[in-house]
UniProtKB/Swiss-Prot annotation:
Gene it is expressed from: rplB
GO BP: any one term: cytoplasmic translation
GO terms for cellular component: large ribosomal subunit
Domain of life, per lineage: Bacteria
Protein name, entry field: Large ribosomal subunit protein uL2
Length: 275
């Protein structure tokens, strides 16, 4: 997909870069697969901010995505590729031969009119879903389950791809985009191919307002705050942070400090993403 730049009629348009998507559906989404969403503004049930930089943004309907692909052995035709405001990837509307319609994450190269199928004996073709034990080593996949039957959890964003590098016993070894090598049960399902809209990372919003449309509020530096608001705050004029290492607003070291606590799944990580 080509990139589109704009005439510099304003500072915001001067630096904006958009991905041209002529193949996307121009009309409304499939109404039966929509659900309502309410905004919290980053507040919990007490009304206190628990997630910073969240608030505002355009109203959106949630698109119900089929992450499980549990309609086995029934072929489906791709009706159209659609935009989804809730994720960076595009979505594909499938129409099964029995008349049911479902949304899936659109893989790269999938287009209207293509046929896909899910099942243990599905052919190795873009958009098809099958267990890792039946996928050849070296194949690029996305939408991978971490537990059999739970639904896709890994590699769902635009341009995401994972390579199946080995299979031994009840586990398959995957190489993630981050460099991490991870073991996953061979009964877990994955979809062939990589996620589409892979040029999403080349987009530039161009102005702060485009970020606000997406529900993202400004991020303020700690050094620009008062001492009551942040450990880096206070001081006369542009003072240093006053700490031997930079910290979060709650005093936890940042910039490289490991915060992962889930030792239960550490055994499945063969190689850390940091090398």
């Amino acid at each position: 997909m080509p990139l589109m730049k704009f005439k510099p009629t304003s500072p915001g348009r001067r630096s904006a870069v958009r991905v041209v998507t002529p193949d996307l559906h121009k009309g409304a989404p499939h109404a039966a697969l929509l659900d309502s969403q309410s905004k919290s503004g980053g507040r919990n049930h007490h009304g206190r901010i628990t997630v910073r930089h969240v608030g505002g943004g355009h109203k959106q309907h949630y698109r119900i995505i089929d992450f499980k692909r549990n309609k086995e052995g029934i072929p489906a035709r791709v009706e159209r590729i659609e935009y989804d405001p809730n994720r960076t990837a595009h979505i594909a509307l499938l129409c099964y031969v029995d008349g049911e319609r479902r949304y899936i994450i659109a893989p790269k190269g999938l287009k209207a009119g293509d046929q896909v199928i899910a099942g243990a004996n599905a052919p190795i073709k873009t958009g098809n879903t099958l267990p890792l034990r039946n996928i050849p080593v070296g194949t690029t996949v996305h939408g991978i389950e971490l537990k059999p039957g739970k639904g896709a959890q890994i590699a769902r964003a635009a341009g995401a791809a994972v390579q199946l590098v080995a299979r031994e016993g009840i586990y398959a070894t995957l190489r993630l985009r981050s460099g991490e090598m991870r073991k996953v049960p061979v009964e877990c399902r994955a979809t062939i191919g990589e996620v589409g809209n892979d040029e999403h990372n080349l987009e530039k919003l161009g102005k702060a307002g485009a970020k606000r449309w997406r529900g993202v509020r400004p991020t303020v530096r700690g050094a620009a705050m008062n001492p009551v608001d942040h450990p880096h705050g206070g001081g006369e004029a542009k003072a240093g942070q006053g700490n031997p290492h930079p910290v979060t607003p709650w005093g936890v070291p940042t910039k490289g400090y490991k915060t992962r606590k889930n030792k239960r799944t550490q055994q499945f990580i063969v190689r850390d993403r940091r090398g």
